[in-house]
């Protein structure tokens, strides 16, 4: 119809016109000003058109050229191609949409909707403009030129921004599926193509490729922006996009969104919020049984480590939740917060939590969305650096100063398939990579005490879940949208602000996850997180053939060393090696046990050496370790061999041979100050051993041994550290009292004390014997400094049967 115009015959049959305009059409005239010249006698619009501001019919490119002194460099390439051509032909074309509301056309109803929206937003300065699809240069583009708009006439900034917006047009054709092409379509184009609203508290947070008008927005000082798609009732065809631009930041979405939706409904139009499809109905509220424990877990994590916010996310389908970002295609992939299973530790971020509650995410978006696709923890050092398409709440995170975030997916054992994702935001001042690593290690202690009603998702479940999801979707006739993988994009980025990593959780139990999670994290030369085993995506991780072929004979070769060294030599991570050991019936890495025996032997040797007049050979401890790889793997056999060898060693250290009927290394034989071998009753011998040890320590110690009576101790508690010296004879009670006094802790019974052993593992101190073992282990360290760690006791954390939370 571009070359012909309709004859304006007053006698034309009205039924013919109704049929012609039923599906909508383009009209063209030589005088575009005639289009909007509604006559009070003929117009059926229930409003005064004089209250509207309309775009000028003449071409505005010349005025803009004069304004900037040159052609606007931000204009789209389609507009550049039309330079030199008479653009008035575009200004003379008008789209008449399908009629469906008491004889009003779609355009008339959109004009009415803009009027209503203007009334709702009259309290503050705002610009309301409509973007509609038009054909230009053989392509379909969105433009706001010659379209209805409204703004505060007293605000020149908005008037200027309106003139700038008229020179932009955005493609409505998605040529590629990558994220970069989606960014180039701009905010209106993304909303038109995605058919879901998009908003930001401040457009100045956009990158230039995401929002081409960002520089002009900064110059005009515009802030909050909301863009929503417009549909006919019962139709999935997007008619256009309404954009609301404000001069103030927009943190809360609900008031403005509800006003716009009501304005559209008043003229028989709608936005994207849809009822739950009947085939997908059926909420599963059984997950609520786990919420009290989750609440306590989040609260304790925030209070212990001063976290600003912790949230719980669940599928919208499980909650039967609706939202403005839902449509028929993405509903089964939409997740949202459980508002009564969140904890706000910092009141200044409460509005951010409310924004998270309003803004649902799709699986794959942000750290939370990625966690729903894996079975291991996901971490980002700075979520505020994500693009809006990768994490829709990135601008809100920037606004509230939130950066580091970690999320983990857990499954409720009572519900079977209901998954929770727990999201923890690190403190605002925790920006340094090393500080974030320490915080992750600290959080691992909390996660070690996760409620027993929750567990991690195994790799097998993850694979089966993917297959069943596809089958269910096909059966219900729902189209799967393309889910963005936000973390793979960051694997090639060297800047720490853009790191989005998936921790290798494997198929570990929750207890193991607590000890391994965050452990061994380091920062490489590119300032990105790494570890010896790497952070591979769990969804892509397969068990290697090498893991399946690691036999007991292979493990025996590494028994003399630490578990970490063995894992590195074999080529697996420590968690995997532990799992392999359990498959072979090895519940504890043997070198740990044998080293304990070795420390006891060394202790006996020191006692013997301190006794005057004692002659004899030293205990052959070196040969004891050398023979260890030949020990049997069976715990019973290992125990018998150790007892046999120890008995032989002790007998060899005395001049007169004697029987060795003892049952353990510490009680198998004894020595007195006269180096006599006692042959009396075993109970007397045990008593004599104890007395002999005390006598030799107090009376017969050499000067060097007396100097060693004091030990250097270094204690870490949260971010604080202290150093002091303690006597070798210190009991656990004395040690705790000394630490509590220095850290000003009133009730130290609520805390656990751990020491760092030779395997670089934290071992709990429960009694005086543990302290004695700790001293023996640490004597072999360079400098002989005992490193201790004070942490909140596990009894202070919520247990499965407790719903009252942390102790006061």
Curated annotation (Swiss-Prot):
GO terms for molecular function: DNA-binding transcription factor activity; transcription cis-regulatory region binding. Signal peptide: none annotated. Pfam families: GAF_NLP, PB1, RWP-RK. It is found in: Nucleus. SMART domains: PB1. It comes from the Eukaryota. Keywords: DNA-binding, Nucleus, Transcription, Transcription regulation. Residues 56-83, 660-680 are annotated as: Disordered. SUPFAM superfamilies: CAD & PB1 domains. Residues 710-793 form the PB1 domain. One of its GO terms (cellular component) is nucleus. GO terms for biological process: regulation of DNA-templated transcription; response to nitrate. Disulfide bonds: none annotated. Residues 536-617 form the RWP-RK domain. Residues 663-673 have a biased composition (Low complexity). Residues 56-68 have a biased composition (Polar residues). InterPro entries: NLP (IPR045012), NLP1-9_GAF (IPR055081), PB1-like (IPR053793), PB1_dom (IPR000270), PB1_NLP (IPR034891), RWP-RK_dom (IPR003035). Probable transcription factor. This is Protein NLP5. It comes from Arabidopsis thaliana (Mouse-ear cress). The gene is NLP5.
